């Protein structure tokens, strides 16, 4: 919010009134995070139900697609669901009105739209103009911003107070100079604590104050020091401001000394001053004085400035206390799946490899392909799109060079410190590991860890190399991350045999999700090492957000009604005889890219700079590529952009595939894949050939069929983004 028109004038509010409003806004922010967490949990439950149900059943199979119960030939044959057309048994049905019924998964999808309140936001979007700025943000920044005439008013107030203080004793002046930073520290600590979700109450008569830690869900009570003017806030942030005669930065920037700014001298505004002092404020300028300190808080109210440990490994970045997953992707981003040499090269088959020679965004993929062309097949399981930062990581993720059979266990002690935000993985030892080097009959093992889905170099931790099949490590791998963020992560620990020539051998791995992990009673626990999963069914089911699109197919007999400038084609400015525009036969596929929700945040401020790229397969040439504009600093972008593909006959609908992928725009590195969808008939066949990109299921397939069966009618659909654009295996 950089425009002045987005601020409202709240200068008439008293100090304690502003404090009360800010407290309400902080509670509102906390409730929003709780609601986002609830919605994310519901959607993860739906994805888990889909995963348990399996993929689309074959025609010859007589098994319930959800519970896998055997169906009979005559009795209890099962019936296809009226929504998804999958055959289910009687136990997996949910009856509806008028004798209709749905399978359990389809019913859960329908209920999810109601439970999460999506219907309300959809109706709101139809009635009111969509804006990217929330009302709470406008009020918060209006309170925190300095009014245009604040400095003039403040200078006049200082002059008047200096005249009144001329008769006071030096002791009183010294006390006032000490009192200013104290009150300033109290005000700043209020904002810091409120950002963490703590509700702070004023000091009571007994000298004790209570604060509710909303993240930890427990009460804390701290005794306020005797004679403290700031009271007790239950937060260690009180120690951040050392009382003393030195001038704070905020005061120096405004040309005001602490003594004059927060002097307890008598004033004509006695009632206001008394009320303000009860809540830790001296005058209305205290709110504006922290503007320089809380500049980042003003720009993003979810940015934590209290010193809460950062999610990013870099110590210079501030943490984001959102409930959604914010990834530290300043260096790179990978998805460890069998389907990706490069996420983009598999996402749009063949197209991005061609584009990489012409566009900066795919240059790293071309470099990877050229350098590792001889080992492309072996690198397919783990090569990152931007893993050139650490070639050692590339080789260690490429697979099992020694064909070692995985065996053994690893002993871990996992703990979390809520006060510092530190995750501690104490790697004690391993036992019964496989032999890494068969010729020398030795194993030089080390342990490597990631907090998935972030597989960047900054997110990697490694132990030292130990010799033997029962190595003793006794090392602690530490991550700094807030608890709300930790609930969205999965710890991946892998054991490797070190080879001096870089041909490391994979010895096993363990994945530990933290969404339901109990950190209250940490204990030592043995984990069995597992082989690397070649076909990872869960990779495609990770919740990456949603994309809202509107599809419409305009048949050939209606496309001549459109003006020529709406048809697909590039304008030319070459001199010479003007060429006639070719007559385009066939219909037009109109794709309206509306918006996306809950995208993965990859920037340090908890946002992304996202855009959508579209292809109509099998034509994956650069000429047919469509892109939207980049929407910056948002995880809920609204593009409202239309893609138009021409020359499509009705019989082509069942042979083509619309692929839409969302990317985060990076200035000096490869763009980061955020998710994608494919819309097609789901037959697996295109023009008589078996292809891996005709793999749509569920809502993707249903939306495509609706469009094909009703030419000329637009259909809107909300599609869950895939976390990997590899083929969905049956």
Swiss-Prot record:
Record PTM Phosphoserine, positions in chain: 147
Pfam families reported for this sequence: C2, FYVE_2
Tissue and organ expression note: Highly expressed in placenta and liver.
Zinc fingers classed as FYVE-type: ranges: 64-106
Gene3D superfamilies named in the record: C2 domain, Zinc/RING finger domain, C3HC4 (zinc finger)
One record GO biological process: intracellular protein transport
GO molecular function: neurexin family protein binding; phospholipid binding; small GTPase binding; zinc ion binding
Gene Ontology CC annotation, any one: exocytic vesicle
Region (Disordered) location: 147-188, 217-271, 294-355
Membrane topology: Peripheral membrane protein
Keyword list, A-Z: Membrane, Metal-binding, Phosphoprotein, Repeat, Zinc, Zinc-finger
C2 domain mapped to chain residues: 406-527, 563-694
Transmembrane spans: none
Residue span, RabBD domain: 7-123
Skewed-composition ranges (Polar residues): 248-271, 305-322
Subcellular location: Membrane
Subunit structure of this chain's protein: Binds RAB27A that has been activated by GTP-binding, and possibly also RAB3A and RAB6A.
Function description: May act as Rab effector protein and play a role in vesicle trafficking. Binds phospholipids.
Name of the protein this chain belongs to: Synaptotagmin-like protein 5
Source organism of the structure: Homo sapiens (Human)
Lineage, top ranks: Eukaryota, Metazoa, Chordata, Craniata, Vertebrata
């Amino acid at each position: 919010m950089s425009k002045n028109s987005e601020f409202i004038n709240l200068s008439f509010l008293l100090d304690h009134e502003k404090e009360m409003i800010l407290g309400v806004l902080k509670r509102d922010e906390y409730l929003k995070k709780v609601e986002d967490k609830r919605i994310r949990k519901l959607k993860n439950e739906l994805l888990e139900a889909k995963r348990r149900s399996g993929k689309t059943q074959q025609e010859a199979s007589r098994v319930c697609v959800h519970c896998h119960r055997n169906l009979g030939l005559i009795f209890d044959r099962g019936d296809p669901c009226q929504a998804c057309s999958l055959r289910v048994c009687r136990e997996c049905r949910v009856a509806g009105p008028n004798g209709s019924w749905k399978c359990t998964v389809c019913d859960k999808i329908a209920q999810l739209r109601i439970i999460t309140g999506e219907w309300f936001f959809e109706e709101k979007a139809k009635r009111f103009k969509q804006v990217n700025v929330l009302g709470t943000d406008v009020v918060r920044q209006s309170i925190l911003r300095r009014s245009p005439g604040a400095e003039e008013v403040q200078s006049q107030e200082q002059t008047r107070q200096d005249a009144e203080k001329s008769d006071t004793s030096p002791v009183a002046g010294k006390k006032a100079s000490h009192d200013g930073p104290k009150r300033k520290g109290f005000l700043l600590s209020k904002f810091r604590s409120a950002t963490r979700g703590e509700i702070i109450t004023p000091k009571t008569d007994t000298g004790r104050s209570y604060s509710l830690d909303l993240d930890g869900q427990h009460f804390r009570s701290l005794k306020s020091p005797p004679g403290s003017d700031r009271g007790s806030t239950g937060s260690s942030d009180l120690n951040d401001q050392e009382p003393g005669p030195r001038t704070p930065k905020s005061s120096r920037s405004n040309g005001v000394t602490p003594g004059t700014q927060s002097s307890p001298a008598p004033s004509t505004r006695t009632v206001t001053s008394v009320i303000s002092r009860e809540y830790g404020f001296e005058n209305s300028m205290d709110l504006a004085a922290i503007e320089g300190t809380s500049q980042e808080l003003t720009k993003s109210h979810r940015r934590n400035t209290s010193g809460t440990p950062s999610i990013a490994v870099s110590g210079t970045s501030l943490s984001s206390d959102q409930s959604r997953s914010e990834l530290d992707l300043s260096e790179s981003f990978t998805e460890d799946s069998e389907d990706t040499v490069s996420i983009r090269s598999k996402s749009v088959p063949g197209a991005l490899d061609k584009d990489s020679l012409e566009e900066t965004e795919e240059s790293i993929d071309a470099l990877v392909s050229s350098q590792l062309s001889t080992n492309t097949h072996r690198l397919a399981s783990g090569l990152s799109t931007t893993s050139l930062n650490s070639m050692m990581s590339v080789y260690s993720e490429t697979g099992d060079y020694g064909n070692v059979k995985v065996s053994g266990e690893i002993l871990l002690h996992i703990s979390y410190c809520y006060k510092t935000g530190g995750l501690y993985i104490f790697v004690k030892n391993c036992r019964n590991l496989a032999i890494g080097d068969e010729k020398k009959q030795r194993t030089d093992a080390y342990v490597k860890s990631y907090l998935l889905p972030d597989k960047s170099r900054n997110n990697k931790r490694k132990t030292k190399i130990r010799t033997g099949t029962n190595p003793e490590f006794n090392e602690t791998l530490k991550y700094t991350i807030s608890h709300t963020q930790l609930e969205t992560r999965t710890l991946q620990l892998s054991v490797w045999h070190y080879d001096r020539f870089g041909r490391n051998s994979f010895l096993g791995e363990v994945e530990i999700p933290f969404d339901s992990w109990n950190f209250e009673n940490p204990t030592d626990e043995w984990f069995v090492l597992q082989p690397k999963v070649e076909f990872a069914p869960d990779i495609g089911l990770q919740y990456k957000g949603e994309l809202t699109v509107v599809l419409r197919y305009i048949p050939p007999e209606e496309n001549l009604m459109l003006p020529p400038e709406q048809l697909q084609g590039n304008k030319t400015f070459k001199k010479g005889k003007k060429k006639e525009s070719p007559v385009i036969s066939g219909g037009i596929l109109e794709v309206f890219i509306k918006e996306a929700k809950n995208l993965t945040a990859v920037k340090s401020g908890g946002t992304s700079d996202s855009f959508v790229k579209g292809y109509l397969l099998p034509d994956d040439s650069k000429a047919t590529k469509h892109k939207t504009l980049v929407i910056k600093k948002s995880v809920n972008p609204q593009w409202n952009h239309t893609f138009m593909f021409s020359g499509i006959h009705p019989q082509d609908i069942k042979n083509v595939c619309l692929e839409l992928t969302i990317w985060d725009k990076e200035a000096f590195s490869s763009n980061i894949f955020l998710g994608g969808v494919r819309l097609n008939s789901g037959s697996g066949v295109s023009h008589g050939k078996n292809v891996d990109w005709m793999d749509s299921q569920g809502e993707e397939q249903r939306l495509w069929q609706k469009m094909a069966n009703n030419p000329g009618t637009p259909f809107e659909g909300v599609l869950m983004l895939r976390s990997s654009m590899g083929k969905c295996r049956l």
